[in-house]
Regions:
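Conserved catalytic core of the tyrosine transesterase superfamily
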Residues: 1-313
């Protein structure tokens, strides 16, 4: 609210400079021209601040129009904002690839995820969670699943022979998601040790979730994981294998960034990455085409330093 209040104050100051003092001038004198002048005035502000202030003043124009105090063309306001204002810079998605690869290496041996306890029932729950967590994280890394998509995945969605699943993804659209051999193998191992629970569920296997809850609330029932559970799994295993400082920096969505970046580095093909990540807009995929400092250093060395006579021996 403070940002909107500040935006309106700056607008009033701009009007005064244009000899249109809000305290003494009838509101009927206000036109889209003054909005355009305000956009020009905001060029000295940061793009993010500019957008906040423009939204505030645009809202005021629309309110005045609704109250029939002035006549405003909404389409004209939109055109002015689009043509003359600046957009805030887009942050490059951060993909800590090395950290994720370290994590994936650590969980390759499922025994690393299992802690020993004397109680047989607790030990079975720990084992189930270990196999599930490994399969879940490998699936995120190798498929580009959004966390809610992975949680909704059912056994009947899978084509085990061909290594893919057919899902209803973002925008309620049907999509094919491909699996690696390692992620498929991890899922099969997890489902194998879960077989008794699945068989006693009283439901058709095809209707059961791939990734199930294994907590007190679920008991021996097969209930699908929630996105919150998915995020908790990643947090727990990141802390276990990488340390507390990376908790929150590596999330289920970070695995999706890793997936897209891996495709681009492996193929250099933007269209492949877009299709496999199921991005509607290729501009989203383009955000992942940045190079790391290591890659730039290597390219620079190859061009300028590799055969240089000036290089120290």
């Amino acid at each position: 609210m403070l940002a909107y209040k500040n935006g309106l104050q700056v607008f009033c100051e701009t009007l005064k400079k244009k000899s249109l003092d809000p305290d003494t001038t009838p509101i009927q004198k206000l036109t889209e021209v003054h909005f355009a002048k305000f956009i020009e005035h905001l060029s000295v502000y940061a793009p993010t601040t500019e957008q906040l202030y423009l939204q505030a003043v645009k809202g005021f124009y629309l309110f005045a129009d609704a109250e029939e105090s002035i006549r405003v063309s909404q389409s004209r306001l939109k055109v002015l904002m689009k043509q003359r204002s600046r957009r805030p810079g887009t942050r490059i998605p951060q993909s800590p690839s090395e950290d994720i690869e370290t994590l994936l290496e650590k969980i390759r041996d499922v025994e690393n995820l299992i802690t020993s306890v004397d109680d047989a029932e607790k030990a079975n729950g720990i084992k189930l969670r270990a196999y599930r967590d490994r399969a879940f994280m490998l699936t995120l890394a190798d498929t580009g699943f959004r966390v809610h998509e992975a949680c909704k995945l059912r056994r009947g969605d899978m084509n085990w022979k061909e290594g893919y699943a057919i899902i209803i993804g973002k925008g309620n659209k049907e999509a094919v998601v491909r699996f690696t051999v390692r992620s498929m193998h991890a899922i099969k191992e997890y489902l194998s040790i879960r077989a008794t629970l699945d068989g006693n569920s009283g439901k058709q296997l095809s209707a059961l979730p791939i990734f199930a809850r294994h907590d007190k609330g679920a008991g021996k029932k097969i209930k699908p994981m929630t996105p919150t559970t998915g995020r908790n799994i990643v947090e727990e295993r990141v802390e276990q294998f990488l340390g507390k400082e990376l908790v929150g920096k590596i999330t289920p969505h970070t695995f999706r960034h890793y997936f897209v970046t891996s495709i681009l580095r492996g193929t250099g093909n933007l269209r492949y990455a877009q299709e496999l990540a199921r991005h509607e807009n290729i501009e989203t995929t383009k955000r992942y085409t940045h190079l790391t400092n290591e890659e730039l250093n290597k390219a620079y060395y190859e061009v300028f330093e590799k055969d240089s006579k000036w290089r120290t021996k």
